[in-house]
Every structure is written in structure tokens, then in C-alpha cells.
């Protein structure tokens, strides 16, 4: 796969739009040399000002750790986002912005399309990868900010009951650079000043990468 060529095509496509996202899908068949690349523009995602999450069990998730009798989708290998979307829609029907996925032990995993983080005291936490969560780019940036001593970061695990007691919760994705979560289930949160620091770290990182790319 010629990633440099894909990168050039992405930049060319992005130059036609003032805002939005450029998405890339690479599909491969049984042969390593046989693949297709799809590059497309997506309009900016509208994110509600007050962002709320409903906790939901996720037996289909790689980190769900549910038994076969718990749900018929356990053990199903799928590249479909249908199950993610279904949990988002359930949350929306119940008056929430999105879903917060839990495993069998009620440990917080991630969202259907985003990673999760939380703040307690002066420390920022993200779930560890052994839970089967996605090692997302934005999650990697949180760890990078920690290694650069911009913020204090730890990988950890937290139950849904424990996350009710933290100071601040936020979500991270391509469209959500540390978006404040105002409510999980019936628990409401206040925004820690550290969250603004995280958001500032993302803004500066993007500017650095833009400068490096277009030198």
C-alpha cells in the first residue's frame, strides 16, 4: 500500500473544502497486493452543547467479555458499524447524546465512535488497551501530551459506579477533541480547568503538524 500516494490524494481532496473531515477506507482481499482505497469528504459533525452518555452493556464488543447465553451476537466477527449505531440510537431514544459501552464487570470501555477519558484531581485517565478498546489516534495524543509533561496521564480501569465520582469526563475522537460530558446516566459533572488544557494541547498539536506538513 502506497501510503504516501494516499496522503497526497487526501491533501488534494481536502484542498477543495473549507472545513470538514477527509476519511479513508482501505479494503483488502485475500491477496496482499489486491486492495481498494476510498477517500471521501465528510461534512463537520454537529456536536450538542450539552453532551450526555447512557451506560450500556456491550456483549458484541471485543472487550465485552460476555458469555454466549447473554446475547446472540457474542462471538460474531463483524466489520459492520451496525451494532455501534444501534447502541447510539438506543441512547438517543432515551434522551442522551450517545452511549457509553461497558463490559460484563461494568468496566467502562469506550463509546460507539469515540474514546473516553476522565479527570480526578490533577490527573487525566484513559482506559488501558488490554480491555480490547481501540487504540485511537486521539487516545495516543493524550498519552503523548503526558509523555511531553503537558498534562499528567495514567492508563487505568474504572467501573461505571466509580466514574460517577470523578471530577470530569470527556470524549475524544477526530471530531471531538476532549468534548466535555455533562452527564452520564443521572450523574452530572462540572468541567475541570484541566480539560481546557487538554483542548489547548490538541489545538497546538494540530498547528504543529500543519506547519510540518506544509513546510
Residue ranges and their predicted role:
Residues 4-28:
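Short, acidic/charged, Gly/Pro-enriched secondary-structure junctions
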Residues 1-12, 32-215:
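Helix-start/capping segments and mature chain N-termini
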Amino acid at each position: 500500500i502506497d501510503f504516501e500516494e494516499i496522503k497526497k490524494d487526501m491533501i488534494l481532496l481536502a484542498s477543495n473544502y473549507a472545513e470538514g473531515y477527509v476519511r479513508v477506507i482501505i479494503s483488502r482481499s485475500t491477496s496482499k497486493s489486491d486492495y481498494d482505497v476510498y477517500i471521501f469528504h465528510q461534512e463537520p459533525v454537529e456536536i450538542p452543547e450539552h453532551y450526555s452518555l447512557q451506560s450500556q452493556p456491550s456483549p458484541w464488543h471485543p472487550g465485552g467479555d460476555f458469555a454466549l447465553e447473554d446475547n446472540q451476537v457474542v462471538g460474531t466477527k463483524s466489520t459492520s458499524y451496525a451494532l455501534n449505531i444501534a447502541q447510539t440510537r438506543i441512547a438517543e431514544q432515551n434522551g442522551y447524546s450517545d452511549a457509553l459501552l461497558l463490559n460484563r464487570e461494568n468496566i467502562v470501555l469506550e463509546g460507539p465512535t469515540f474514546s473516553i477519558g476522565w479527570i480526578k484531581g490533577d490527573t487525566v485517565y484513559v482506559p488501558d488497551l488490554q480491555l480490547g478498546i481501540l487504540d485511537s489516534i486521539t487516545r495516543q495524543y493524550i498519552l503523548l501530551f503526558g509523555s511531553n509533561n503537558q498534562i499528567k496521564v495514567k492508563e487505568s480501569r474504572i467501573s461505571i459506579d466509580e466514574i460517577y465520582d470523578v471530577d470530569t469526563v470527556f470524549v475524544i475522537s477526530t471530531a471531538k477533541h476532549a468534548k466535555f460530558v455533562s452527564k452520564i446516566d443521572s450523574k452530572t459533572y462540572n468541567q475541570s480547568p484541566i480539560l481546557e488544557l487538554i483542548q489547548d494541547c490538541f489545538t497546538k498539536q494540530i498547528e504543529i503538524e500543519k506547519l510540518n506538513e506544509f513546510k
